[in-house]
Amino acid sequence: MIDIDHLCPGCMQNNPTPDSPCPHCGYSKDTQPLKNALPVFSILEGKYLIGRALGKGGFGITYLAMHLPTETIVAIKEYFPSTLACRASDNETVLPGMENQKLYFHTGMRSYAKEGEILQRLSGTSGIVQFREMLFCNNTAYIVMEYVPGLSLKKYMKQQKTPFTESEALTLMWPILMALQ
């Protein structure tokens, strides 16, 4: 049974001293959440417990989460186009920003759902994150997928401070290129 009072939203592991930084990942309860992110420990569809936001792009926010029935750590990508949407007062429901943006918002959500369908078709392919399911709640769409810990390519490249050699780039990209063939 999960003890939410001692669960770290930064890594979804037990933090025996929740008032102190997590001994596993260093997350502090004083960490500022990303703007427009779901509140930590929100629950989706009664089965996914939301942890910290992992990142944000123009069309969505990705969260660390836990599938409650199995206590499996997953990543959940939320459709949240920052230029077209805002949160309702409940801090969970996503709303088109303005009346004239509803069409663009819903068209984008349909495209987002297609992205989920493509990811589902590619499940089982080496080099591609594993799709788990698609959710539609809070007036938006969510893609639930396997959580792969580690650095993003962008962060990795920033740390390296030098470009990949042709051989390194090919080694990294080859499984993805084969999956997309």
Which residues are covered by each model-predicted region?
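Conserved N-lobe loop of protein kinases adjacent to the ATP-binding glycine-rich P-loop
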Residues: M66-V74, F80-L84
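Protein kinase glycine-rich loop
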Residues: G51-G57, T62
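Protein kinase catalytic-loop region centered on the HRD/HxD motif
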Residues: I176-Q181
